[in-house]
Protein backbone atom coordinates (compact mmCIF):
# COMPACT_ATOMS: atom_id res chain seq x y z
CA UNK A 1 0.00 0.00 0.00
CA UNK A 2 2.88 2.35 0.76
CA UNK A 3 4.28 1.86 -2.76
CA UNK A 4 0.86 2.39 -4.34
CA UNK A 5 0.46 5.64 -2.42
CA UNK A 6 3.81 6.89 -3.71
CA UNK A 7 3.00 5.87 -7.29
CA UNK A 8 -0.29 7.77 -7.12
CA UNK A 9 1.56 10.84 -5.86
CA UNK A 10 4.20 10.71 -8.57
CA UNK A 11 2.25 9.48 -11.57
CA UNK A 12 -1.28 10.73 -12.20
CA UNK A 13 -3.42 9.49 -13.78
CA UNK A 14 -2.45 5.89 -13.17
CA UNK A 15 -4.40 2.65 -13.49
CA UNK A 16 -3.56 0.08 -10.83
CA UNK A 17 -4.85 -3.46 -10.43
CA UNK A 18 -4.06 -5.72 -7.49
CA UNK A 19 -3.69 -9.45 -8.09
CA UNK A 20 -3.53 -12.10 -5.37
CA UNK A 21 -4.50 -15.69 -4.65
CA UNK A 22 -8.01 -16.57 -3.56
CA UNK A 23 -7.04 -17.26 0.05
CA UNK A 24 -5.84 -13.69 0.56
CA UNK A 25 -8.61 -12.04 -1.50
CA UNK A 26 -11.01 -11.20 1.40
CA UNK A 27 -8.22 -9.44 3.32
CA UNK A 28 -6.99 -7.74 0.15
CA UNK A 29 -10.45 -6.38 -0.62
CA UNK A 30 -10.80 -5.12 2.94
CA UNK A 31 -7.42 -3.39 2.74
CA UNK A 32 -8.13 -1.90 -0.68
CA UNK A 33 -11.53 -0.67 0.45
CA UNK A 34 -9.79 1.40 3.11
CA UNK A 35 -6.98 2.51 0.79
CA UNK A 36 -8.74 3.18 -2.53
CA UNK A 37 -12.04 1.46 -3.40
CA UNK A 38 -11.43 2.18 -7.09
CA UNK A 39 -8.53 -0.30 -7.25
CA UNK A 40 -9.94 -3.68 -8.32
CA UNK A 41 -8.73 -6.90 -6.70
CA UNK A 42 -8.32 -9.87 -9.06
CA UNK A 43 -7.60 -13.45 -8.03
CA UNK A 44 -5.11 -15.76 -9.72
CA UNK A 45 -5.05 -19.54 -9.48
CA UNK A 46 -1.68 -20.57 -8.09
CA UNK A 47 0.09 -23.50 -6.54
CA UNK A 48 3.20 -23.80 -4.45
CA UNK A 49 6.10 -26.19 -4.21
CA UNK A 50 5.97 -27.35 -0.60
CA UNK A 51 9.34 -27.78 1.07
CA UNK A 52 9.83 -27.87 4.83
CA UNK A 53 13.01 -26.68 6.45
CA UNK A 54 12.70 -29.02 9.44
CA UNK A 55 12.40 -32.19 7.30
CA UNK A 56 15.00 -34.05 5.25
CA UNK A 57 14.64 -34.15 1.47
CA UNK A 58 14.32 -37.95 1.58
CA UNK A 59 11.47 -37.80 4.07
CA UNK A 60 9.64 -35.20 1.97
CA UNK A 61 10.03 -37.33 -1.17
CA UNK A 62 8.57 -40.32 0.70
CA UNK A 63 5.61 -38.40 2.14
CA UNK A 64 2.74 -39.38 -0.21
CA UNK A 65 0.35 -36.54 0.64
CA UNK A 66 3.11 -33.95 0.19
CA UNK A 67 4.17 -35.40 -3.17
CA UNK A 68 0.56 -35.51 -4.37
CA UNK A 69 -0.08 -31.92 -3.31
CA UNK A 70 3.04 -30.75 -5.14
CA UNK A 71 2.01 -32.65 -8.28
CA UNK A 72 -1.48 -31.15 -8.08
CA UNK A 73 -0.08 -27.67 -7.60
CA UNK A 74 2.11 -27.99 -10.69
CA UNK A 75 -1.13 -27.98 -12.67
CA UNK A 76 -2.42 -25.03 -10.64
CA UNK A 77 0.73 -23.07 -11.55
CA UNK A 78 0.11 -23.93 -15.20
CA UNK A 79 -3.52 -22.82 -14.90
CA UNK A 80 -2.40 -19.61 -13.19
CA UNK A 81 0.06 -18.96 -16.00
CA UNK A 82 -2.62 -19.19 -18.71
CA UNK A 83 -4.99 -17.10 -16.60
CA UNK A 84 -2.30 -14.43 -16.08
CA UNK A 85 -1.30 -14.55 -19.76
CA UNK A 86 -4.87 -13.84 -20.91
CA UNK A 87 -5.43 -11.12 -18.31
CA UNK A 88 -2.17 -9.39 -19.25
CA UNK A 89 -2.97 -9.56 -22.98
CA UNK A 90 -6.34 -7.92 -22.32
CA UNK A 91 -5.03 -5.27 -19.92
CA UNK A 92 -1.52 -4.71 -21.36
CA UNK A 93 0.03 -2.94 -18.35
CA UNK A 94 3.21 -0.89 -18.73
CA UNK A 95 4.91 -2.66 -15.85
CA UNK A 96 4.30 -5.58 -13.46
CA UNK A 97 5.44 -5.39 -9.84
CA UNK A 98 5.66 -8.55 -7.72
CA UNK A 99 6.54 -9.09 -4.07
CA UNK A 100 7.49 -12.76 -4.17
CA UNK A 101 5.43 -15.71 -3.05
CA UNK A 102 4.00 -18.53 -5.11
CA UNK A 103 1.19 -16.50 -6.69
CA UNK A 104 3.77 -14.23 -8.35
CA UNK A 105 5.45 -17.02 -10.33
CA UNK A 106 2.80 -17.55 -13.05
CA UNK A 107 2.22 -13.79 -13.28
CA UNK A 108 5.92 -13.04 -13.65
CA UNK A 109 6.47 -15.74 -16.28
CA UNK A 110 3.50 -14.47 -18.29
CA UNK A 111 4.84 -10.91 -18.09
CA UNK A 112 8.23 -12.11 -19.32
CA UNK A 113 6.75 -13.89 -22.35
CA UNK A 114 4.71 -10.79 -23.21
CA UNK A 115 7.81 -8.59 -22.84
CA UNK A 116 6.20 -6.53 -20.09
CA UNK A 117 8.85 -5.03 -17.76
CA UNK A 118 9.00 -6.82 -14.42
CA UNK A 119 10.10 -5.25 -11.13
CA UNK A 120 10.42 -7.46 -8.06
CA UNK A 121 10.88 -6.70 -4.40
CA UNK A 122 12.43 -9.33 -2.13
CA UNK A 123 11.59 -8.62 1.49
CA UNK A 124 13.27 -11.66 3.02
CA UNK A 125 16.98 -11.91 3.73
CA UNK A 126 17.00 -15.19 1.80
CA UNK A 127 15.52 -15.22 -1.73
CA UNK A 128 12.65 -17.65 -2.19
CA UNK A 129 12.21 -19.92 -5.20
CA UNK A 130 9.85 -17.53 -7.01
CA UNK A 131 12.17 -14.55 -6.74
CA UNK A 132 15.20 -16.63 -7.70
CA UNK A 133 13.42 -17.58 -10.93
CA UNK A 134 11.94 -14.16 -11.69
CA UNK A 135 15.14 -12.36 -10.68
CA UNK A 136 16.85 -13.68 -13.83
CA UNK A 137 14.35 -11.83 -16.03
CA UNK A 138 13.44 -8.84 -13.88
CA UNK A 139 14.33 -5.40 -15.17
CA UNK A 140 14.92 -4.12 -11.62
CA UNK A 141 15.18 -5.75 -8.19
CA UNK A 142 14.62 -4.05 -4.85
CA UNK A 143 15.77 -5.81 -1.68
CA UNK A 144 14.62 -5.54 1.90
CA UNK A 145 18.01 -6.36 3.43
CA UNK A 146 21.57 -5.36 2.45
CA UNK A 147 22.71 -6.80 -0.90
CA UNK A 148 25.27 -9.10 0.75
CA UNK A 149 22.42 -11.46 1.66
CA UNK A 150 21.39 -11.96 -1.99
CA UNK A 151 22.80 -13.49 -5.16
CA UNK A 152 20.98 -11.21 -7.60
CA UNK A 153 22.82 -9.37 -10.36
CA UNK A 154 24.36 -6.30 -8.72
CA UNK A 155 23.82 -4.04 -11.73
CA UNK A 156 20.03 -4.20 -11.42
CA UNK A 157 19.62 -4.61 -7.66
CA UNK A 158 19.11 -1.84 -5.11
CA UNK A 159 18.88 -2.10 -1.32
CA UNK A 160 15.74 -0.06 -0.73
CA UNK A 161 14.54 -1.59 2.50
CA UNK A 162 10.92 -2.61 2.85
CA UNK A 163 8.18 -0.14 1.87
CA UNK A 164 5.93 0.68 4.79
CA UNK A 165 3.35 3.34 5.48
CA UNK A 166 4.48 6.59 7.08
CA UNK A 167 2.04 5.74 9.88
CA UNK A 168 4.87 3.60 11.22
CA UNK A 169 7.14 6.05 13.02
CA UNK A 170 8.49 6.46 16.51
CA UNK A 171 5.62 7.38 18.85
CA UNK A 172 6.07 10.03 21.51
CA UNK A 173 4.84 9.29 25.03
CA UNK A 174 1.75 11.40 24.32
CA UNK A 175 1.05 9.50 21.08
CA UNK A 176 1.43 6.17 22.86
CA UNK A 177 -1.03 7.23 25.54
CA UNK A 178 -3.54 8.41 22.92
CA UNK A 179 -3.12 5.15 21.02
CA UNK A 180 -3.80 3.14 24.18
CA UNK A 181 -6.96 5.17 24.70
CA UNK A 182 -7.98 4.49 21.09
CA UNK A 183 -7.60 0.75 21.67
CA UNK A 184 -9.32 0.99 25.07
CA UNK A 185 -6.49 -0.59 27.04
CA UNK A 186 -5.23 0.48 30.46
CA UNK A 187 -2.98 3.53 29.92
CA UNK A 188 -1.27 2.91 33.27
CA UNK A 189 -0.10 -0.61 32.39
CA UNK A 190 2.55 -1.81 29.93
CA UNK A 191 0.97 -3.10 26.71
CA UNK A 192 2.11 -6.44 25.28
CA UNK A 193 1.02 -7.07 21.68
CA UNK A 194 1.25 -10.58 20.21
CA UNK A 195 0.74 -10.93 16.46
CA UNK A 196 1.43 -13.76 14.05
CA UNK A 197 0.52 -11.75 10.95
CA UNK A 198 -2.70 -11.66 8.96
CA UNK A 199 -3.11 -15.45 8.86
CA UNK A 200 -2.07 -15.95 12.47
CA UNK A 201 0.46 -18.37 13.95
CA UNK A 202 -1.03 -21.39 15.69
CA UNK A 203 1.93 -22.44 17.82
CA UNK A 204 2.49 -18.88 19.00
CA UNK A 205 -1.23 -18.46 19.70
CA UNK A 206 -1.30 -21.70 21.69
CA UNK A 207 1.73 -20.72 23.77
CA UNK A 208 0.24 -17.29 24.45
CA UNK A 209 -3.02 -18.84 25.60
CA UNK A 210 -1.16 -21.15 28.01
CA UNK A 211 0.97 -18.30 29.40
CA UNK A 212 -1.78 -15.67 29.30
CA UNK A 213 -2.50 -15.39 33.03
CA UNK A 214 1.18 -14.81 33.78
CA UNK A 215 1.52 -12.32 30.92
CA UNK A 216 -1.43 -10.40 32.36
CA UNK A 217 0.55 -10.00 35.58
CA UNK A 218 3.06 -7.97 33.54
CA UNK A 219 0.61 -5.74 31.68
CA UNK A 220 -2.31 -5.61 29.26
CA UNK A 221 -2.26 -8.09 26.37
CA UNK A 222 -3.64 -7.76 22.84
CA UNK A 223 -3.49 -10.96 20.77
CA UNK A 224 -4.04 -10.79 17.00
CA UNK A 225 -4.75 -14.45 16.30
CA UNK A 226 -5.66 -14.71 12.62
CA UNK A 227 -9.17 -15.73 11.58
CA UNK A 228 -8.52 -19.48 11.47
CA UNK A 229 -8.03 -19.96 15.21
CA UNK A 230 -10.11 -17.07 16.50
CA UNK A 231 -13.20 -19.07 17.56
CA UNK A 232 -11.10 -21.65 19.40
CA UNK A 233 -9.11 -18.97 21.25
CA UNK A 234 -12.23 -16.97 22.02
CA UNK A 235 -13.55 -19.94 23.99
CA UNK A 236 -10.26 -20.23 25.93
CA UNK A 237 -9.58 -16.58 26.76
CA UNK A 238 -11.30 -13.87 28.81
CA UNK A 239 -13.76 -11.43 27.21
CA UNK A 240 -12.27 -8.29 25.69
CA UNK A 241 -11.54 -5.63 28.29
CA UNK A 242 -8.92 -2.98 29.03
CA UNK A 243 -6.54 -5.71 30.20
CA UNK A 244 -7.01 -8.28 27.41
CA UNK A 245 -8.22 -8.19 23.83
CA UNK A 246 -8.42 -10.86 21.12
CA UNK A 247 -8.75 -9.83 17.47
CA UNK A 248 -8.81 -12.12 14.41
CA UNK A 249 -7.33 -9.55 12.02
CA UNK A 250 -6.73 -5.81 11.94
CA UNK A 251 -7.23 -4.17 8.55
CA UNK A 252 -6.54 -0.62 9.71
CA UNK A 253 -4.96 1.16 12.68
CA UNK A 254 -2.34 -1.57 13.07
CA UNK A 255 0.27 1.19 13.29
CA UNK A 256 -1.48 2.71 16.28
CA UNK A 257 -1.74 -0.67 18.03
CA UNK A 258 1.94 -1.47 17.53
CA UNK A 259 2.87 2.12 18.35
CA UNK A 260 0.99 1.87 21.64
CA UNK A 261 2.84 -1.30 22.64
CA UNK A 262 5.65 -1.41 25.17
CA UNK A 263 6.82 -4.73 23.73
CA UNK A 264 5.72 -6.76 20.69
CA UNK A 265 5.94 -10.52 20.17
CA UNK A 266 5.83 -11.44 16.49
CA UNK A 267 6.87 -13.83 13.77
CA UNK A 268 9.84 -12.99 11.56
CA UNK A 269 7.83 -11.80 8.59
CA UNK A 270 10.01 -9.23 6.84
CA UNK A 271 7.45 -6.43 6.52
CA UNK A 272 6.22 -6.62 10.10
CA UNK A 273 9.81 -6.58 11.36
CA UNK A 274 10.61 -3.39 9.44
CA UNK A 275 7.38 -1.75 10.58
CA UNK A 276 8.47 -2.40 14.15
CA UNK A 277 11.96 -1.08 13.38
CA UNK A 278 10.42 2.15 12.08
CA UNK A 279 8.38 2.36 15.29
CA UNK A 280 11.60 1.84 17.26
CA UNK A 281 9.81 -0.83 19.24
CA UNK A 282 11.32 -3.38 21.66
CA UNK A 283 10.58 -6.61 19.81
CA UNK A 284 10.62 -10.33 20.55
CA UNK A 285 10.76 -12.50 17.43
CA UNK A 286 9.60 -16.12 17.29
CA UNK A 287 10.66 -17.26 13.79
CA UNK A 288 8.78 -20.12 12.18
CA UNK A 289 11.57 -22.61 11.53
CA UNK A 290 9.37 -24.93 9.48
CA UNK A 291 8.80 -22.61 6.53
CA UNK A 292 10.38 -23.20 3.14
CA UNK A 293 14.08 -22.40 3.04
CA UNK A 294 14.09 -21.35 6.69
CA UNK A 295 13.61 -17.76 5.54
CA UNK A 296 12.17 -16.58 8.87
CA UNK A 297 15.20 -17.98 10.68
CA UNK A 298 17.44 -16.07 8.27
CA UNK A 299 15.38 -12.89 8.67
CA UNK A 300 15.69 -13.12 12.45
CA UNK A 301 19.44 -13.77 12.23
CA UNK A 302 20.01 -10.43 10.46
CA UNK A 303 18.64 -8.52 13.46
CA UNK A 304 19.91 -10.86 16.16
CA UNK A 305 23.43 -10.40 14.75
CA UNK A 306 23.19 -6.70 15.67
CA UNK A 307 21.51 -7.38 19.03
CA UNK A 308 18.52 -5.40 17.73
CA UNK A 309 15.80 -7.84 18.86
CA UNK A 310 15.28 -10.76 21.20
CA UNK A 311 14.71 -14.11 19.53
CA UNK A 312 12.88 -17.11 21.00
CA UNK A 313 13.36 -20.56 19.49
CA UNK A 314 9.93 -21.86 18.54
CA UNK A 315 10.62 -25.41 19.74
CA UNK A 316 11.58 -24.05 23.16
CA UNK A 317 8.40 -21.99 23.25
CA UNK A 318 6.24 -25.00 22.39
CA UNK A 319 7.87 -27.07 25.16
CA UNK A 320 7.88 -24.19 27.63
CA UNK A 321 5.38 -21.38 26.93
CA UNK A 322 6.62 -19.61 30.07
CA UNK A 323 9.64 -18.47 28.04
CA UNK A 324 7.31 -15.80 26.63
CA UNK A 325 6.73 -14.49 30.14
CA UNK A 326 10.42 -14.61 31.04
CA UNK A 327 11.48 -12.75 27.90
CA UNK A 328 8.77 -10.08 28.20
CA UNK A 329 9.77 -9.55 31.83
CA UNK A 330 13.41 -9.07 30.78
CA UNK A 331 12.36 -6.30 28.39
CA UNK A 332 9.98 -4.54 30.78
CA UNK A 333 12.26 -4.78 33.83
CA UNK A 334 15.21 -3.08 32.11
CA UNK A 335 13.91 -0.07 30.13
CA UNK A 336 17.42 1.25 29.47
CA UNK A 337 18.54 -1.99 27.80
CA UNK A 338 15.23 -2.22 25.93
CA UNK A 339 15.64 1.32 24.59
CA UNK A 340 19.21 0.62 23.42
CA UNK A 341 18.02 -2.54 21.69
CA UNK A 342 15.21 -0.56 20.01
CA UNK A 343 17.70 2.09 18.86
CA UNK A 344 19.81 -0.59 17.17
CA UNK A 345 16.63 -1.99 15.61
CA UNK A 346 15.63 1.43 14.27
CA UNK A 347 18.88 1.64 12.29
CA UNK A 348 17.38 -0.90 9.87
CA UNK A 349 14.40 1.32 9.06
CA UNK A 350 14.42 2.85 5.58
CA UNK A 351 11.86 5.68 5.62
CA UNK A 352 12.23 6.37 1.89
CA UNK A 353 11.78 2.74 0.81
CA UNK A 354 8.26 3.20 -0.58
CA UNK A 355 9.28 6.20 -2.67
CA UNK A 356 12.44 4.47 -3.90
CA UNK A 357 10.52 1.36 -5.00
CA UNK A 358 7.82 3.50 -6.63
CA UNK A 359 10.53 5.34 -8.58
CA UNK A 360 11.97 1.99 -9.74
CA UNK A 361 8.54 0.87 -10.95
CA UNK A 362 7.79 4.11 -12.78
CA UNK A 363 11.22 4.29 -14.41
CA UNK A 364 10.99 0.63 -15.51
CA UNK A 365 7.61 1.09 -17.23
CA UNK A 366 7.85 0.85 -20.98
How would you describe each model-predicted region?
Residues 1-75:
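Glycosyltransferase specificity loop/lid
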Residues 14, 38, 112-177, 185:
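Active-site-proximal region of nucleotide-activated glycan assembly enzymes
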Residues 18-19, 24, 32, 52, ...:
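Donor-nucleotide binding loops and adjacent catalytic segments primarily
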Residues 34-38, 82-97, 104-119, 132, ...:
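Glycosyltransferases and closely related glycan-assembly transferases
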Residues 116-117, 262-263, 280-288, 308:
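Structural loop-to-beta junction motif characteristic of Rossmann-like glycosyltransferase folds
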Residues 350-366:
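C-terminal alpha-helical cap of glycosyltransferases
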Residues 181, 330, 337-351:
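A short, well-ordered alpha-helix in the C-terminal region of glycosyltransferases
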Residues 94-95, 259-274, 281-282:
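Acidic donor-binding loop of glycosyltransferase active sites
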Amino acid sequence: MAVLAEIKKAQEPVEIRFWCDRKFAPQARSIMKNFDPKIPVHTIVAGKFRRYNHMSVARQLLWPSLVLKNLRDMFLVLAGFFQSFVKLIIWRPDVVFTKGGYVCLPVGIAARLLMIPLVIHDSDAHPGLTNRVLGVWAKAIATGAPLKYYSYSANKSVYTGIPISDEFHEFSNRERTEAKKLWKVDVNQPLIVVTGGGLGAQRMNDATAVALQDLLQLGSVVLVSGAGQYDELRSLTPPNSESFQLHPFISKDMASLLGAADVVITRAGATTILELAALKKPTIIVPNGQLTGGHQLKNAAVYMEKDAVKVIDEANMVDNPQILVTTVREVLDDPEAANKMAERFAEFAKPDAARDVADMIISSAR
